[in-house]
Amino acid sequence: MAVVTMRELLDAGVHFGHQTRRWNPKMRRFIFTERNGIYIIDLQQTLTYIDQAFEFVKETVAHGGTVLFVGTKKQAQEAVQVEADRVGMPYVNHRWLGGMLTNFQTVSKRLNRMKELQAMDAAENGYEGRTKREVLMLTRERTKLERVLGGIAEMTRVPSALWIIDTNKEHIAVAEAHKLNIPVVAILDTNCDPDVVDFPVPGNDDAIRSTALLSRVISTAVEEGKKAREERQLAAAKDAAGDAKPEAEEAPAAAEAEEAPAAEAEEAPAAE
């Protein structure tokens, strides 16, 4: 079964690129035609690249990897959060903090601070002994941290791959990923640079329906990867149990074999 159909791509407007005056010549090979001053993306190629991106994400997750969903532009914020939450993956949908990948140790400290403030807020007497002004300042700090870091609260290490909507806007995230050799999977609109992406998905990165559909494809790949990982773990557990069973059966048999000669010796009549 196809990951996504041509009809779904058309209905979501994935084929609409930018105005012809706003384009990156490197994207020429992904463009089908021009219509009314707008570039039309070749969806046949999009389908092929979607399959490649899907398999990569699926295998990455199947081998224990994580995928960080990134999209801070208004059209992408909801899709990024919804799809990442759906499959238990981290996300950034408000602001990319410089060093979020390359200086993850410092970011981890901010995550710990956020959790500390959340615990304080949840406790019955968490703010006991503090003035109203102090409580207000702590609340503001917690809210700010949750807005920026809430999506990566459970991220304990840098991700295995990034899913990015609008590589131009998220150029810092792309640069950090490259510095750490983290593969980038991204939507490539006609104004993007395909050279900075490892697994491109040619398409519209401005329409809400387009970003939602393509993010759904990636989250489904994550879902499939998790299933594959669980199946591998179950198979490994069964194999381990199967190897242990013959050993357990051999032990009593060996003991019986050792006891038999001794019993025969006891039963034999004494020589006169």
Curated annotation (Swiss-Prot):
Single GO biological process annotation from the record: translation
Ranges of Acidic residues composition bias in the record: 256-272
Region feature (Disordered): 224-272
Endpoints of the signal sequence: none
PANTHER family: 30S RIBOSOMAL PROTEIN S2 PROKARYOTIC AND ORGANELLAR, SMALL RIBOSOMAL SUBUNIT PROTEIN US2M
A GO CC annotation given for this chain: cytosolic small ribosomal subunit
Keywords, comma-separated and alphabetical: Ribonucleoprotein, Ribosomal protein
Family statement drawn from the similarity comment of this UniProt entry: Belongs to the universal ribosomal protein uS2 family.
Record Pfam families: Ribosomal_S2 (PF00318)
Name assigned to this protein: Small ribosomal subunit protein uS2
Membrane-crossing residue ranges in chain numbering: none
Basic and acidic residues composition-biased segments: 224-233
One GO MF term: structural constituent of ribosome
Top-level taxonomic group: Bacteria
